[in-house]
Amino acid sequence: MLDATIDADVFRESVDAIAALVTECRLHATEQGLRTRTVDTANVAMISLELDKDVFESYQATSSEMGIDIVKIKNVLSMMGKGDPVHLALAEESRKLEVSFQSYQYSITLLDTNTIRKDPNAPTIELPGKVVISGAALSAAIKAASVVSDKIALGIDPEKGIFYMEAEGDTDHIRLELGDDKLISLVPVQARSLFSLDYLKDMGKTMSKAEKVEISLGIDHPVEFTFDIADGKGHVMYLLAPRIEAD
């Protein structure tokens, strides 16, 4: 069972965070809130999203699992105005999600969860390098790198005390170095990995709105981005596998 009301802007921000990686997901409702954890079809990236019940204007739920078509939900979101209260209700018998706002009442058929990949396990990998940066600065750097290449290196140079982002194309090159004066915080541990900008560009659109994003790095390891949404009552984690660097 689910019966909840949420601000349209918060709902949109949450759906956009998921849509950056996948077109469908298993959404779990509990007494504490909503959550999902899913990987993209290529097994390259993962998202974990949690919305505390305090995010909602009203919230009642029992343990439920829903198969959500993210594309359909985004289409419905396009009809919502800024700040509209959105009512969500799970019709258990018909397996439909009722979405109501303004004078509209949508009844969206849920996907069969048996056709959606099971939730992946939580990552346990050690990523000792830590950087905290504003979402706007991170997004801008990703955009800048995408002008010259389809991949970007993220790293930490502990001797210089900097976090750097570097991209190299066939003829062009860009490097951005950020020290303590440009970062919120830095744990200066040697780290460097190469990543696909195709994924990062989509993630960056969501992260651009975050006051701060924590980046966790290793050497030729995945990168983890964690940040809050909904005034700290919602939490997002992206995990992106590295690209193999050519010799």
Curated annotation (Swiss-Prot):
CDD domains under this entry? PCNA (cd00577)
Which SUPFAM superfamilies does the UniProt record give? DNA clamp
Q: Which UniProt keywords apply?
A: DNA replication, DNA-binding
Q: Name one GO molecular function term.
A: DNA polymerase processivity factor activity
The coiled-coil regions, if any, are none
Give the UniProt record's GO annotations in the biological process aspect: leading strand elongation; regulation of DNA replication
Matching InterPro entries: DNA_clamp_sf, Pr_cel_nuc_antig, Pr_cel_nuc_antig_C, Pr_cel_nuc_antig_N
Identify its protein family.
Answer: Belongs to the PCNA family.
| Quaternary structure and interacting proteins, as annotated | Homotrimer. The subunits circularize to form a toroid; DNA passes through its center. Replication factor C (RFC) is required to load the toroid on the DNA.
What does the function comment of this entry state? Answer: Sliding clamp subunit that acts as a moving platform for DNA processing. Responsible for tethering the catalytic subunit of DNA polymerase and other proteins to DNA during high-speed replication.
The protein's name in its UniProt record: DNA polymerase sliding clamp
Higher taxonomy: Archaea, Methanobacteriati, Methanobacteriota, Stenosarchaea group, Methanomicrobia
